Each structure stands twice: as C-alpha cells, then as structure tokens.
C-alpha cells in the first residue's frame, strides 16, 4: 500500500514539475469554401451501453445584442474499446440550426498523440468505433502525433471513417512545434480539410451551417477569430485546439466551440489535478463550459497522452454531438 502511495506522489510530482507554462492564445480571417448538398440519414449506434441523460442548464449563444438560447443534454456511455473508454453524447438544440440539419451527427476527437498511450491496435479499434457511430462529419482538434514517422499511418487509418460531409481538423501546439507541413500535406492527400483560419460551408437542401477553424491559437499574431466575418444568422461551429482561445479572443457569431488540449487533466485523483493546461485552472478542464459571453464550449478529454503514457480519472473519449432545431 505504501509503495502505491509513493508511486502516485512521485507521479504527481513529475507531472507538476514537467508542466509547461500556459501561453496566451489567439487567431486571422477566412472565406467559405466547400459546399455539399446532401447527406443520408444517420443510423443508430448498436454496440454501446445506454446511460441516463444529464440535463444541462439553458445557456446563451452569441455575444451579440439578441442572444439566442441553446438547450443541451448529455449522456455518457462506456465502451469496450482499446482506443477509447467512453463515448460522450450531446444533444445540442439551437434556434439557428437549419431544419435540413435536424439530427446532424458530429464526431469530435482530439489529442491522439499517436503513438503515446494510443498504439496501432488502439487506433484501429478507435476507427472501427467511429465507423460504427456513423457520424455525418468528423472534426479533429489537433495534437495528432508524437513524431513525424507516425503522421502517415495515423491519417491513413483515420481516412477509413469516410463520413458523408468529410473530415475537418485544426492543428495543436505539438503540430506547430514539429511535422506541421507533413501533417497538412498528408491530411490533404487523404481528402481531409485543414482549417487554419479558414471557414467551410456545409450545404443541404438549400440551407447551410459553417465550420470555422483556428490557426495556431498560441500565436498572438492570430488574434482575430475567423468567425468575425460570418453572419450572426448562420449556425457556426468554431474548432480550436485550446479552450482558452474562446475566452481570450472575441469569437462573435460562434454558436458552439469545440476544443481539446487539456486532456481532462490526464491524471485526476481525489479532486486533485496536478497538471492544468489552461490559464483558467479547472474552468475549461473538460465537458460543457461557457466563456464570459456565455458561448457554449465542449472540451474533450482527448485520446492520447503527453509526457507520461498514463490516464487516471480522465477517460479517453469520443464526443458525439447531434444538432437539433430549437423552436
């Protein structure tokens, strides 16, 4: 027993000492690019156990004068999978969701850090589960690799998912520190869309939603959100690696932001989280949060690990979001 206690004390100390200091973050501008006209109905998930939905309080959306409200419910389902431990489901209802996108299913993954805790077998299991979940679109939040040699095998496997509306991703701090060009080139080679301060318009039956992505959010040169040029009438999803960006930078016209980076703390025991990859402490640690303008933000625990290949109390996860028209 004493050995176990000493081990976790040592682990917390190592993680705390090795924690990188948080940096200020930001974002530049963009134009709608791609149009897609049809999308088939999504099939229900068969292989995950059911869980009771947890009702979240009603929240507000855009930081403009007339602020529409959103209604959000969440449920968590554990899975028997070598890549992730659970799927976190959100039903996201908002007035700006077009009727044609009722039931639109978004899969969101982040921080694979391949190969860290996530190895080849786990990656294949993860992809099998993503295929089974049948998302209409796959969004990715960056920090993909732990070495340039892992870039091609990672995206080659992820490309097997083939969601009807495509695969979109932003890059994380690891990806700007190394392998940036390899990652962008490989993603594009496999038909994926890299959103470095770009937006893309998804169309269905004459209606649209917009996906916006942030270039290196730790670079102060990127302090203008790509959402600022968009219409407040559109439903806009902002994809960014770190949740701090949504608080530090004006992200007007954003209806929902998605982020990773925190790993959910990666190691959490008895309420103690020795590593917090955010200047805001536990405020944006994991799950549903809001910036000061009450813009909803979903932060995922991610999948892989950094510094040490261990997760305690912060399960690796896929986030699934289903959009609904709030009337």
Q: Where are the regions a protein language model picked out?
A:
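Beta-strand-turn-beta hairpins that frame and shape the catalytic cleft
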Residues: 85, 94-107, 192-193, 200-212, ...
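Active-site neighborhood of phospho(di)ester-bond hydrolases with catalytic His/Asp-centered motifs
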Residues: 109-110, 137-143, 166-173, 195-198, ...
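Conserved beta-sheet core of the metallophosphoesterase superfamily
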Residues: 159, 243-322, 326-327
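Short beta-strand/loop segments at the ligand-binding rim of alpha/beta enzyme cores
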Residues: 228-238
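Acidic, histidine-bearing metal-coordination/catalytic regions of metal-dependent phosphoesterases
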Residues: 4-8, 19-105, 116
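Extended active-site neighborhood of metal-dependent phosphoesterases/phosphodiesterases
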Residues: 67-68, 74-79, 91-93, 155-220, ...
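Membrane-embedded segments
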Residues: 83-85, 97-185, 190-193
